[in-house]
Amino acid sequence: MTFRELINEVLIRLREETIATDWSGNINDSSTVTDYQKVIGSLINDSKRNVESYHDWLVLRETKAITTVSGTRNYNLSSGQEIKLIDVTNQATGGKLVQVSRQYINSTLYPTENTGEPMYYAFNGADSDSNLKVDLEPKPDSIQTISFDIVKFQDELKTASTKLKIPTKPVVLGAWARAVSERGEDGGTNTGVIAMEVSESINQAVILDSGNVQYESEWYVK
C-alpha cells in the first residue's frame, strides 16, 4: 500500500476528505495536500516506526557486506543508524563473528595488536551520514568478505507512491488511534476499542511473520 493510500485509509475512518491524486515530492512541501492531511501523514510515520520496533520483520532484513583490507580494523557498514544485527559471517570460512565490548577491543591493542582472521566485532562510531562503523578483532591481514545480516527500519514515508514494507493494518489502525487522541473525539468508535484493535492487529502480524523464522532459535552443528 502506498503512502497516499495509507493516509486515505485513516482519513476515511475519520470521515475526512481523502487525497484524490498523488502529490509531487515531499508531502510537507506540497500545496495540494491540506494541513490536516499532512498531520495524518506524520501520524502514519509515527505508527510505522512503532510497529517496526515490535519485531524483526522479514521484509526489513538485508545483508551488508564489507571487504577487509590488510592492516585496517575499522569499517563502515553503510547501514544507517537504526539497525539491529542478526548474524555476522566470514564468507571465506563460514565462521561466525561474535560481538564484544569496546573495552575488550581496547584490551587487545596493547602491547601489540593481534592480526589474522577476524573473530570479533564491536561498534565504533559513525560517519557524517550516521552510518555505523565497526572494529574487527583480530585486525585483518588479508582480503576477506564479512556479511552483516541486519534489520533496518524503512525511511520515513514522504512521497505519495512510496510503498510501506511492513504489514499495513497495524500501521493504519495505529495512526487512526493517534488521530482520534490528537483531536480528542471521533464521534464514533470508542478509543478503547481502537487501542484493542491496534494491539490485536500487531499481535496477529507478528505471529504470521514469526512462523517463517521459527528455526532461528535452534543451533546446528556442522
Task: Report residues per predicted region.
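Glycine-enriched, solvent-exposed interface loops adjoining structured elements
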Residues: 1-222
